Curated annotation (Swiss-Prot):
CDD domains given in the database record: IPMI_Swivel
GO biological process: L-leucine biosynthetic process
Protein family membership: Belongs to the LeuD family. LeuD type 1 subfamily.
Transmembrane residue ranges: none
Reaction catalysis annotation: (2R,3S)-3-isopropylmalate = (2S)-2-isopropylmalate
Function: Catalyzes the isomerization between 2-isopropylmalate and 3-isopropylmalate, via the formation of 2-isopropylmaleate.
Protein name: 3-isopropylmalate dehydratase small subunit
Organism: Cytophaga hutchinsonii (strain ATCC 33406 / DSM 1761 / CIP 103989 / NBRC 15051 / NCIMB 9469 / D465)
Length: 201
């Protein structure tokens, strides 16, 4: 996975609450088993007409909005468990999703796929939406090392929480296997000195 330290980017605002995984990636697209190619189907039913043409009123079809940060309403990623939702978001180019609440399973799937879910207060989320409404090119700065998100050019910022293990993985670009391999020497040293493991030899 790509290393993640600090991202400064314009945003794609999606001020809709309770966005579930079927809205993120409809079930009819779940037949594929590889991660690539799902980005074009992200928010498909909102993004395209039945004939496949883009809906002009959907934010991802508006040339004013682009970037690596998706900002969504409260309770993002609810509904059925499907890792494809994280795959679609990542394949569409997003590295960060900001909301005031995430479904637990979506949060885990996002982190496992190199996407940082940043949970902020309702008030700070509103500040972001207000700033982007006033200026479509407004940038956010997401500082993972210090666990701070800020609205660029203003004094508005807020800290966020992340599991320390997942933080380490994101900063180093590790998935779970990469992390285990990175501490292989420590594991082997422990195996040699552990009296409990020696009993199994």
């Amino acid at each position: 996975m790509e290393k993640f330290i600090t991202i400064k980017s314009t945003v794609v605002p999606l001020p809709i609450e309770d966005v579930d995984t079927d809205q993120i990636i409809p079930a009819r697209f779940l037949k594929a088993t590889t991660k690539e190619g799902f980005g074009k189907s992200l928010f498909c039913d909102w993004r395209y007409n039945q004939d496949g043409t883009p809906k002009a009123d959907f934010v991802m079809n508006n040339p004013l909005y682009s970037g690596q940060i998706l900002v969504a309403g409260k309770n993002f990623g609810c509904g059925s468990s499907r890792e494809h939702a994280a795959w679609a978001i990542g394949d569409a180019g997003f590295r960060v999703v900001v909301s005031s609440f995430f479904a637990d399973i979506f949060r885990g799937n996002a982190l496992n796929n190199g996407i940082l879910p940043v949970q902020v207060s309702d008030a700070f989320l509103k500040s972001i939406f207000d700033a982007v409404a006033a200026n479509a090119k407004q940038e956010l700065v997401v500082d993972l090392a210090n666990q701070v998100i800020s609205i660029a050019g203003t004094d508005l910022k807020e800290s966020f929480v992340i599991n320390e293990y997942k933080k380490t993985c994101l900063i180093n670009g590790y998935d779970d296997i990469d992390y285990v391999l990175s501490i292989k020497d420590k594991i082997e040293a422990y195996e040699k000195t552990s009296k409990y493991l020696s009993l199994l030899a």
